[in-house]
Amino acid sequence: MFLYVIAYDIPDDRRRKKMADLLEGYGQRVQYSVFECTLSKSKFNELQKRLRKIYQSEEDSLRFYPLSGHTLTQVDIWGEPPLTKPPGSVIV
């Protein structure tokens, strides 16, 4: 399992809503266009496949950032919500 930060910039309101609705089924919205999703490799691949059906390469931008255990210890958060913790992880 990895914690993925997924960020997007989609100018079309309808596509942006579809993207957000899909991502809400996989993780937690932490900012307007940013989600944290704890996913297995197979779930991540499934999500990407579903996102590709919405994504328009000539207009949209999608970014996927996998966070390692070491990286998670370096995260600094100001405000809410708190960092999504992968199952079985300990953040020091």
Curated annotation (Swiss-Prot):
Keywords: Antiviral defense, Endonuclease, Hydrolase, Magnesium, Metal-binding, Nuclease, Plasmid. CRISPR (clustered regularly interspaced short palindromic repeat), is an adaptive immune system that provides protection against mobile genetic elements (viruses, transposable elements and conjugative plasmids). CRISPR clusters contain sequences complementary to antecedent mobile elements and target invading nucleic acids. CRISPR clusters are transcribed and processed into CRISPR RNA (crRNA). Functions as a ssRNA-specific endoribonuclease. Involved in the integration of spacer DNA into the CRISPR cassette. One of its GO terms (biological process) is maintenance of CRISPR repeat elements. InterPro entries: CRISPR_associated_Cas2, Virulence_VapD/CRISPR_Cas2. GO terms for molecular function: metal ion binding; RNA endonuclease activity. Its EC number is 3.1.-.-. Its cofactor is Mg(2+). This is CRISPR-associated endoribonuclease Cas2 3. It comes from the Bacteria. Mg(2+) binds at residue 9. PANTHER family: CRISPR-ASSOCIATED ENDORIBONUCLEASE CAS2, CRISPR-ASSOCIATED ENDORIBONUCLEASE CAS2 3. It comes from Synechocystis sp. (strain ATCC 27184 / PCC 6803 / Kazusa). It is an enzyme of class 3 (hydrolase).
